[in-house]
């Protein structure tokens, strides 16, 4: 499979772009464990062209994590084009357009999945971004706005005609948000459409490499993208069996990388999300107070001390 000039091996599994999750530390760890491609947190086009510092920082990438994509979102055509030009200068391998984020603060303003209610503008943005940059442009979207508007089959053809190099489909509508089950049947139908020649990447309800393999076998997609199941679990991209202590080592490393590459305050905030979600602490009796302490820690030393206490108790 290829996206532009970027080649992948068989059955590639990607890390999805996620706000406050796919910072550089987490991306580097996911890459180490086998993620075929990683994406930055999504980037607001409006904030980018206004030169907002925290947004500009999201463009920082490392050669170690390649291939890497930067995803942008917005509702204004000119802003999306200008943002894409800025992103191109950051040197990613791919620019991805987010037409799938369902959260109210994004979709409610007409961006992300909100574009599913304005297909002409979605196509205009896509066409103009493709024309404005030399990097491969890809799109991530959903099946439609709701179950009365399952438009993905036609939309995939329209986006392909705009010149995108790959399409990621999350198997839910915007109205579903993250409830119910992802419908991979429609993703498979898009892949089997004889008019479609770009890679189709499936996304939704993938919790392991075994489930990714089933998606490849059943629906014939070119790649699988994993999102929420990666929280606190960068080793999900590997079949390697890790001990509790090894997993704790990895989470401590994530903390150190984030503090070093971002700053202590925000690095801790980013790492807390993974500590709150990681499966390694689930089911541990009498763990509530320890969890609260982890999520309240304000310095790296305090958080490392708490994790060492956990290691002593459980490792």
Question: Which residues does each predicted region cover?
Answer:
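Aromatic- and acidic-residue-enriched carbohydrate-binding clefts of CAZyme catalytic domains
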Residues: 116
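Glycine-rich, positively charged N-terminal anion/phosphate-binding segment
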Residues: 2-4, 9, 18-93
């Amino acid at each position: 499979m290829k996206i532009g000039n970027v080649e992948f091996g068989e059955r590639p599994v990607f890390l999805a772009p996620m706000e406050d999750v796919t910072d550089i530390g987490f991306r580097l760890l996911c890459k180490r464990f086998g993620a075929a491609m990683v994406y930055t947190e999504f980037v607001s086009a409006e904030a980018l062209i206004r030169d907002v510092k925290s947004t500009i920082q999201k463009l920082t990438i490392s050669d170690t994590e390649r291939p890497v994509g930067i995803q942008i979102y917005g509702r204004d055509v000119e802003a999306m084009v200008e943002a894409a030009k800025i992103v191109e200068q950051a040197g990613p391998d791919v620019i991805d357009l987010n037409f799938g984020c369902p959260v109210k603060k994004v979709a409610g303003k007409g961006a992300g999945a909100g574009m599913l209610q304005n297909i002409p503008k979605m196509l205009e943005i896509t066409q103009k971004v493709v024309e404005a940059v030399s990097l491969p442009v890809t799109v991530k979207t959903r099946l439609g706005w709701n179950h009365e508007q399952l438009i993905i089959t036609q939309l995939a053809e329209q986006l392909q005609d705009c010149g995108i190099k790959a399409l990621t489909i999350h198997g839910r509508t915007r109205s579903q948000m993250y409830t119910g089950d992802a419908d991979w049947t429609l993703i498979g139908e898009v892949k089997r459409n004889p008019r479609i020649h770009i890679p189709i990447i499936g996304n939704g309800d993938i919790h392991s490499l075994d489930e990714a393999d089933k998606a490849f076998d059943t629906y014939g997609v070119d790649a699988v993208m994993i999102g929420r199941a990666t929280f606190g679990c960068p080793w999900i991209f590997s079949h390697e069996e890790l001990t509790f202590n090894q997993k704790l080592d990895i989470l401590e490393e994530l903390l150190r990388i984030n503090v070093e590459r971002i700053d202590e305050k925000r690095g801790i905030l980013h790492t807390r999300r993974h500590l709150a979600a990681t499966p390694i602490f689930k089911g541990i009796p009498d763990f509530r107070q320890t969890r609260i302490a982890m999520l309240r820690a304000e310095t790296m030393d305090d958080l490392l001390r708490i994790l060492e206490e956990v290691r002593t108790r459980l490792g």
